[in-house]
Amino acid sequence: MICRVFTTFMIAAFLSQAPATKKIDIVSVTGCLREHGSNWVLVAATDPTPSSANQAPAAEIPPAPPAGKNTFRLIGISEFNLPQMKDRTVVIRGLFIKDKVSRINVTSAVEAVASCAPGAPK
């Protein structure tokens, strides 16, 4: 009986010290959509801002390409027709995965402007 109580106590103590799972934020970024080999990236992109997974409403679509400094690799893109938006400014929403090369698991992609910001990396 004492052994069982001790074991239960030790398991509870261990579980309470387990690291919390990382929260992955849903963000919105705007930038120039480029194809690099088999990867799609957003270059000259804005800083990520908290958002929802839904498509950006018209009020949040910029009228001109923003001058951002970030690059994001886009993943989970099979549902979106990215070749149609290549070399254009797009608003991307999705799950933000911060890393050496930050990624966004795309939940929404909307064309904003039919061109990219001047000086956007090719």
Protein language model annotation of sequence segments:
Residues I2-A18:
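Hydrophobic h-region of N-terminal signal peptides that target proteins for export
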Residues F14-K122:
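Conserved RNA-binding domains used in RNP assembly and mRNA/RNA metabolism
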